[in-house]
Amino acid sequence: MLNSGDIGFMIIAATYVFLMTPGLAFFYGGLAQRKNVLNTMMMSVAFMGLSSVLWVLCGYSLSFSGDLGGVIGNLKWFAFNGVGAEAGPYSDNIPNMGFALFQMMFAIITPSLITGAVAGRMKFKAIFLFVFLWQFVVYYPMAHMVWGGGFLAQIGSIDFAGGNVVHISSGVSGLVLAILIGKRKGIEKRSVVPHNIPFVVLGVSLLWFGWFGFNAGSALAADGLALHAFTTTNTSAACAMLSWMIIDIIKGGKPTVVGACTGGVIGLVAITPGAGFVPIWASFIIGTLVSPICYFALSVLKPKFGYDDALDAFGCHGIGGIWGGIATGLFAQTSINPVAKWDGLVFGDYHLFVAQVLSILVTIAVAVVGTLICVGIVRLFTKLRVDENSENVGLDDSEHGECA
């Protein structure tokens, strides 16, 4: 039965999640070089338009209507045909359209996360075409497999708000794209510092604020589970922020603003798959441990393997999402949310942990193969990378004719 309180809650939650994309634009824009700040922000802002149109036309239908081989849906709800004010198949207390619009906000921010990996060197028309294709090849299949009753849901894996669908898929795709497009010119000979740290703080503040809608809203009701997810979300982010500050002090003698902000973001990433499944005490562990895990990835793995993930999309979202998925398999409890078929490994049952590991491996495979396919198609129409002169001048001027 439709519930007006739950409907209002979901409208507010969707609005919160929408705000995360401009928050990401400020976060990435602040981390970028001054000559690339507008281009970096545009690679988030533009997808507020593209992803919205695609979602209404066919994205929602391909993700959530029907089932073709456990991988993708069908076009039953093309252009929101049949998606109205009646209770939807995924929740009997909110309309189908309410669920569709909430999910649209996830489809908007996810491809924007990828762009941080290739900031400062990828043609705008190339990234625009890539994201157009990526939604069909990676995002819609992942959303269906995890949330639309597809293969990963059928094996019993769980993902409360997007550890696989949003963070691992975008982080891994960003890594593959960064490797394919190559390093920024002269990056080995110079250090790139954020051009506007107050932008970073503003961006993280908007992201953290929006994440309450992202995770609590995934309960699909204004109930105790939403409150639980809200609490685990904030706790994990806070612990990760403090944990990163401690690492900064140990390594450099001083806590850094960028480090604290990075810690907050990865704490939010790590709790996303388990926010509505793990006990509150587990969110302390998840948040505290994600900082040293991601710090190791950024300070050891990244230089060792030599890839240029410009704004650490993979190091934060890919690695953070993988840890979050594993942690969900460790700490989830059916007593908190019966959507989980089994308790986590620390409670004596291995089934969920195995399903979580398998779902992570499938997500990585889909992201890698899907990204390679999309890049292959994009290269038929345009080069991926700007020329050396454009890179030296900056993409704000060469790609958009503007200056911050």
Show the residue positions of the predicted features.
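Glycine- and aromatic-enriched membrane alpha-helices
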Residues: 1-404
